[in-house]
Regions:
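Positively charged, small/polar-rich N-terminal and surface patches that mediate targeting and assembly
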Residues: 1-109
Length: 109
């Protein structure tokens, strides 16, 4: 079976809602990690103090056939088509270990 990793970077405070909607679209779970950008547009100034905006990184592993509706729902829920709201990308998983307790991730030999 083929698996896909979906990674979305959204504004801080929005990940819980985005994950909730991704689950409604078929995701079985997600990992949320806090992060910050290093790009020039990430640093903002307030009273001559640099403030870096923090982000939430959402990571979802799913079966390939479930990936498209989950991806589409993340884009919709996170409003990722609006400029500056975040990014999303996917990549195939070639090796997977450690999710033995999750039936959908048991690899058949």
């Amino acid at each position: 079976m083929d698996y896909i990793c979906i990674v979305a970077i959204v504004e801080r405070g929005k990940a819980d809602f985005v994950v909730k909607m991704a689950k409604k679209a078929g995701a079985n779970g997600a990992t949320i990690i806090y992060g910050r950008g290093t790009g020039e547009t990430e640093a903002k100034k307030f009273l001559n103090i640099h403030i870096e905006s923090s982000k939430e990184v959402i990571i979802i592993l799913t079966e390939k056939q479930k990936a498209k509706p989950i991806y589409d729902e993340i884009v919709r829920a996170g409003k990722l088509k609006d400029p500056g709201t975040g990014i999303i990308f996917t990549f195939p998983i070639s090796n997977l270990l450690g999710l033995h307790h999750r039936e959908e991730f048991i690899l058949e030999d």
